[in-house]
């Protein structure tokens, strides 16, 4: 008869519960809810599969909850008299891709890459085809700004080509 390692069993069974608990208690939940109400920011997740205790990929619940943790925080949970530490850090590169690193204790580690796609309310997406002159490829990017949870973040569009920003012609 095979014996189950109690620590491994608890980590397997509580990994989703831990994410759910953080989802409920996280102050960033309200920030995400505010952004989703305005419908000016859509986040698409690209999950990189990894081997987690024999599972072939991340479970559906974890995929739905991971996008809420877009901050640099460390949480401490006391679950069943065992302390688990969840560290979350993130960065946004120049191509507006957000890389989120999540570590629960020393047992769970995953990388989530999400591409931020913006939608201009009431009009079409601005065009960058002629904004960069002869420089190619010229693509539309959104400049990040820091906003509190109680205010809507304005979208600032720029055209980017080879590391240099250009004004968006349709918005000037």
Curated annotation (Swiss-Prot):
Keywords: Developmental protein, Disulfide bond, Secreted, Signal. One of its GO terms (biological process) is guard cell differentiation. Disulfide bonds join 128-159, 132-138, 135-161, 147-153. It holds the Pfam family EPF. Residues 1-27 form the signal peptide. One of its GO terms (cellular component) is extracellular region. It is found in: Secreted. It comes from the Eukaryota. Controls stomatal patterning. Belongs to the plant cysteine rich small secretory peptide family. Epidermal patterning factor subfamily. This is EPIDERMAL PATTERNING FACTOR-like protein 7. It comes from Arabidopsis thaliana (Mouse-ear cress). The gene is EPFL7.
């Amino acid at each position: 008869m095979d014996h189950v390692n109690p620590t491994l069993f608890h980590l397997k069974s509580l990994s989703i519960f831990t994410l759910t608990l953080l989802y409920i208690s996280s102050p960033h939940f309200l920030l995400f809810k505010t952004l989703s109400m305005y419908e000016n920011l859509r986040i698409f997740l690209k999950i990189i599969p990894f081997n987690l205790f024999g599972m072939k990929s991340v479970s559906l619940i974890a995929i739905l909850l991971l996008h809420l943790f877009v901050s640099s925080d460390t949480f401490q949970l006391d679950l069943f008299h065992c302390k688990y530490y969840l560290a979350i850090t993130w960065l946004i590169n120049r191509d507006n891709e957000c890389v989120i690193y999540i570590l629960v204790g020393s047992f769970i580690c995953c990388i989530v890459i999400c591409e931020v796609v913006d939608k201009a309310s009431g009009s079409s997406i601005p065009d960058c085809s002629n904004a960069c002159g002869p420089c190619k490829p010229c693509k539309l990017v959104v400049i990040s700004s820091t906003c509190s949870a109680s205010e809507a973040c304005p979208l600032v569009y720029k055209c980017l080509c080879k590391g240099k920003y250009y004004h968006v012609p349709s918005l000037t």
